[in-house]
Amino acid sequence: MGSSVEQNILVTGGAGFIGTHTVVQLLKDGFKVSIIDNFDNSVIEAVDRVRELVGPDLSKKLDFNLGDLRNKGDIEKLFSKQRFDAVIHFAGLKAVGESVENPRRYFDNNLVGTINLYETMAKYNCKMMVFSSSATVYGQPEKIPCMEDFELKAMNPYGRTKLFLEEIARDIQKAEPEWRIILLRYFNPVGAHESGSIGEDPKGIPNNLMPYIQQVAVGRLPELNVYGHDYPTEDGSAVRDYIHVMDLADGHIAALRKLFADPKIGCTAYNLGTGQGTSVLEMVAAFEKASGKKIPIKLCPRRSGDATAVYASTEKAEKELGWKAKYGVDEMCRDQWKWANNNPWGYQNKL
């Protein structure tokens, strides 16, 4: 496809799980990309794999910068040497449990980092942003599917940073109407690039279901803890909307194109999910099918603050962004397993 004039995109947190997959799609779509990442929850190997995936020609259009959004000088350095057409802002801490134990770290990283980014963008007159929000801004929704105009509420400090940052975006855009900001509320990103060469590789014990299942499947962890088996759902386990990371990556490109095409976008939120709810136990069964491995489970009490069922209404993104998730649970598990099987220790390549 390619853009007629090469547009230059800054991707914060571009070495992370969703970042790497989005960078691959951006490069393939003809964009130039600069990544800024501090490797808090990622590694340089992930960026090297992205380069291998896209090949030497497209790799020339990817520029990596080690930096931290909490240090304004790191952002300033980037903006002073090149012009960016837009920013995709992934960088942030994302573990609910850790945010409850260490809220200051979350406020410092997620809020201060983002405010520094806005300040620098404004200074250099780059006023287009795609922001990583989250379905956590719906709290425990009274009804499902979640629609973008629902009342928002956060259940924990992580969710609160996402909610605050949405409000900050709305306030900035209202005061300075030339800004164009799209807030993408992700549901539960899973899967991996179909090549099996990039995927999710969290540091420490995984906080999310799929990397946890994956580590059990490859023998890194003995069993999967299933939190809550007495929810009012068909099998008693919690229901979530899992979305393939490649669908998510394409959603970011659809959002970018919307920013460039629609001067009246203002500050608008879109759900990125499949619109389908899948229970934890259904996901385990699908992964067992894809991998041919048995996943031993341990039923544990519910975690406080976990909702029974959350899934997206996807109509708004379909109608306004022309985007719809293509992949189902079987493909998510197939690609997750390919990544896990090729890289049992993630990017560390331990034997």
From Swiss-Prot:
Q: Does the keyword Cell inner membrane apply?
A: no
Q: What is this protein called?
A: Bifunctional UDP-glucose 4-epimerase and UDP-xylose 4-epimerase 1
Species source reads Arabidopsis thaliana
The entry's note on the tissues where this protein occurs is: Ubiquitously expressed. Highest expression in stems and roots.
InterPro entries, from UniProt? Answer: NAD(P)-bd_dom, NAD(P)-bd_dom_sf, UDP_G4E
Cofactor(s) recorded in Swiss-Prot or TrEMBL: NAD(+)
Subunit text: homodimer. Heterodimer.
The knockout note for this entry states: No visible phenotype.
